[in-house]
């Protein structure tokens, strides 16, 4: 079994409050840009045969140069992303279809979809998710929430509603893995219906409700760089990961 990775790197990161033209995936975290670490992990993962990256048009040449410079030979295509994250994933799905064709070349393969701003995923975790995706059809990493979670009052959003049972909740992350034909079909259907979901797992749930999604319990290191505070936390995680190797 070989996996194909899709890296979503088209976001502009409004919550990061960056100057115009700058995006969070290219901020320096230690020596390298945030996205470097994600690409490096997928390059090292033995289950991954090819990486497709969706990014802003102005960053395509930069990412291609990065892949050459650091020997990320699994990065096969860097293409233009879409208006929304889901559009970017769809663009990569269509590129995969174009490259592999519909003659069975994708049979027994899985597709792993990852956020380019989750730099701390580890190669062994990628391999485990790929294997579980193959075995169960779909697999998504998640962590247990540390905080109490409450609904907002439905009648007045200035107040809380009921408290949720934390033991039945998980915070979902990436990479999310799926049997190739399953996720490609889900994206094609969603594109036809102009339907948008919060992530690829939700898309699968919408179009293939019979497909159970295996839980892969992840540690708390696999954060998504979203706000300025995440960069400070990221530096601490990077230091700890380096010390543990």
From Swiss-Prot:
<dbReference type="InterPro" id="IPR018294">
    <property type="entry name" value="ISPD_synthase_CS"/>
</dbReference>
<comment type="pathway">
    <text>Isoprenoid biosynthesis; isopentenyl diphosphate biosynthesis via DXP pathway; isopentenyl diphosphate from 1-deoxy-D-xylulose 5-phosphate: step 2/6.</text>
</comment>
<feature type="site" description="Positions MEP for the nucleophilic attack">
    <location>
        <position position="166"/>
    </location>
</feature>
<feature type="site" description="Positions MEP for the nucleophilic attack">
    <location>
        <position position="224"/>
    </location>
</feature>
<dbReference type="InterPro" id="IPR050088">
    <property type="entry name" value="IspD/TarI_cytidylyltransf_bact"/>
</dbReference>
<dbReference type="Pfam" id="PF01128">
    <property type="entry name" value="IspD"/>
</dbReference>
<keyword id="KW-0414">Isoprene biosynthesis</keyword>
<keyword id="KW-0548">Nucleotidyltransferase</keyword>
<dbReference type="InterPro" id="IPR029044">
    <property type="entry name" value="Nucleotide-diphossugar_trans"/>
</dbReference>
<feature type="site" description="Transition state stabilizer">
    <location>
        <position position="15"/>
    </location>
</feature>
<dbReference type="GO" id="GO:0019288">
    <property type="term" value="P:isopentenyl diphosphate biosynthetic process, methylerythritol 4-phosphate pathway"/>
</dbReference>
<dbReference type="InterPro" id="IPR001228">
    <property type="entry name" value="IspD"/>
</dbReference>
<keyword id="KW-0808">Transferase</keyword>
<comment type="function">
    <text>Catalyzes the formation of 4-diphosphocytidyl-2-C-methyl-D-erythritol from CTP and 2-C-methyl-D-erythritol 4-phosphate (MEP).</text>
</comment>
<protein>
    <recommendedName>
        <fullName>2-C-methyl-D-erythritol 4-phosphate cytidylyltransferase</fullName>
        <ecNumber>2.7.7.60</ecNumber>
    </recommendedName>
</protein>
<comment type="similarity">
    <text>Belongs to the IspD/TarI cytidylyltransferase family. IspD subfamily.</text>
</comment>
<dbReference type="InterPro" id="IPR034683">
    <property type="entry name" value="IspD/TarI"/>
</dbReference>
<feature type="site" description="Transition state stabilizer">
    <location>
        <position position="24"/>
    </location>
</feature>
<dbReference type="GO" id="GO:0050518">
    <property type="term" value="F:2-C-methyl-D-erythritol 4-phosphate cytidylyltransferase activity"/>
</dbReference>
């Amino acid at each position: 079994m070989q996996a194909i990775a899709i890296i979503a790197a088209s976001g502009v990161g409004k919550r990061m409050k960056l100057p115009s033209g700058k995006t969070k995936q290219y901020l320096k975290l230690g020596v390298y840009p945030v996205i470097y670490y994600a690409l490096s992990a997928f390059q090292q993962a033995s289950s991954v045969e090819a990486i497709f990256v969706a990014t802003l048009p102005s960053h395509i040449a930069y990412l291609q140069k990065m892949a050459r410079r650091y020997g990320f030979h699994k990065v096969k295509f860097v293409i233009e992303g879409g208006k929304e994250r889901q559009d970017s994933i769809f663009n990569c799905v269509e590129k995969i279809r174009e490259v592999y064709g519909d003659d069975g070349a994708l049979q027994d393969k899985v597709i792993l979809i990852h956020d380019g701003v989750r730099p701390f995923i580890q190669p062994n975790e990628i391999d485990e998710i790929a294997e579980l995706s193959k075995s169960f059809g779909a697999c998504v990493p998640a962590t247990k929430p540390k905080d109490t979670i409450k609904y907002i009052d439905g009648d007045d959003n200035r107040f809380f509603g009921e408290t949720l049972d934390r033991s039945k909740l998980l915070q979902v992350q990436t990479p999310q893995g799926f049997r190739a034909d399953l996720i490609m079909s889900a994206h094609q259907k969603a594109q036809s219906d102009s339907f948008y979901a919060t992530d690829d797992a939700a898309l699968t749930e919408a179009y293939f409700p019979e497909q159970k999604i295996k839980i892969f319990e992840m540690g708390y290191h696999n954060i998504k760089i979203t706000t300025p505070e995440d960069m400070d936390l990221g530096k601490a995680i990077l230091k700890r990961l380096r010390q543990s190797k």
